[in-house]
């Protein structure tokens, strides 16, 4: 098809791509204007609610937003690493501190909070930092509650309610979430929001992970 295009048609297509890139860059700058630090090549689709003077996003940060996507650092610190993807309807609210590593993907309608907001009769208010390690994939409508530390390369199943720490290379599911499988990555690592497997910086070969059933 490209060979059938005239030089003028190719030029017009190139100009359209450049304009689209500029629009995306301006959109990201406007949507993320309140963050304290913004990385390179950020993309924001839709109109997310982004509020927080103590929020940092790394390079290649992507938000696929509807009107419900909310990122709030409030009185706390909210940190996103490089190549983080946030899907429609996800809500992340930091009152104390939430840290998200590199290559992390949030599916739609995920809810992450580091505070109960208020206590109830017989149970005091709880507030504790949340940490999500590199290479994690958080499934649709999963909830991550205050005080949870999720290790590296963890897959959180759809609808899971994570109430306690999760070790590296685990698949967790259920309410409350528990480890149902251990995942082994013998040679390569996965960038969660990509469809393909990509090699670790020090490894040339790539293999898919071996799934090991737990007793």
Name these PLM-found stretches.
Residues 122-135:
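Glycine-rich NAD(P)-binding loop of Rossmann-like domains
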Residues 1-113, 133-135, 152, 168, ...:
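Domain-scale signature associated with acetyltransferase and cell-envelope carbohydrate enzymes
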Residues 116-117, 122-124, 148, 182-183:
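Conserved catalytic-core motifs of eukaryotic protein kinase domains, centered on the activation segment
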């Amino acid at each position: 098809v490209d060979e059938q295009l005239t030089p003028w048609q190719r030029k017009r297509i190139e100009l359209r791509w450049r304009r689209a890139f500029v629009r995306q860059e301006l959109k990201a700058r406007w949507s993320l204007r309140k963050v304290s630090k913004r990385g390179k090549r950020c993309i924001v689709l839709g109109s997310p609610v982004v509020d927080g003077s103590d929020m940092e996003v790394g390079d290649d940060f992507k938000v696929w937003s509807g009107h419900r996507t909310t990122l709030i650092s409030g009185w706390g610190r909210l940190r996103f690493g490089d190549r983080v993807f946030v899907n429609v309807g996800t809500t992340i609210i930091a009152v104390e501190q939430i840290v998200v590593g590199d290559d992390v993907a949030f599916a739609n309608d995920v809810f992450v909070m580091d505070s109960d907001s208020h206590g109830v009769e017989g149970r005091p208010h709880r507030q504790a930092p949340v940490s999500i390690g590199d290479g994690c994939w958080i499934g649709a409508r999963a909830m991550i509650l205050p005080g949870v530390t999720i290790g590296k390369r963890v897959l959180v199943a759809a609808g899971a309610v994570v109430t306690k720490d999760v070790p590296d290379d685990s698949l967790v599911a259920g309410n409350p979430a528990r480890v149902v499988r251990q995942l082994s990555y013998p040679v390569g690592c996965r960038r969660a929001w990509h469809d393909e497997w990509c090699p670790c910086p020090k490894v040339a070969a790539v293999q898919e992970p071996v799934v090991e059933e737990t007793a």
